[in-house]
């Protein structure tokens, strides 16, 4: 009997990610249950090259129109935008979404069916936000979840080190990463998410 093997991302797909990594955003949804067993949907956008979480928002009723508006907001305030947007084949990425994204000038790249590894960077962030934040917090409602995620994203972007980018945080200034003070100063710990995490700074 011929043995079958699970195949990873194709060489063509890997080449695309390698060649255009600095021009790619990825987006995805994940679900969060509140303490009253309501289901909330979290939509987020992450930059492939820097690992910066560009946008995160919560809704109880995701639609193609709502999802498209999130991409529009990503491109506001002179943030710039990517050339490519990687996402799966969820029904929320419908005709309205397609039209709005195309008008912005971003090309959609749909992953194959049942291939989460094709959107691995987005999937990895979902794992991080769950294990480092949501698994330790009781969520009361939509507003509370938005607040918790905003605080975690601030920590993730500005302070959390990433192995894939040389143990730097996505938005950390290079000066912070390389600065060595000639004079020793007191180090203070600043709590994040109710002391779930801490960031460390030199005292002024």
Segments from the language model and where they lie:
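Charged DNA-binding/catalytic regions of mobile-element recombinases
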Residues: 1-204
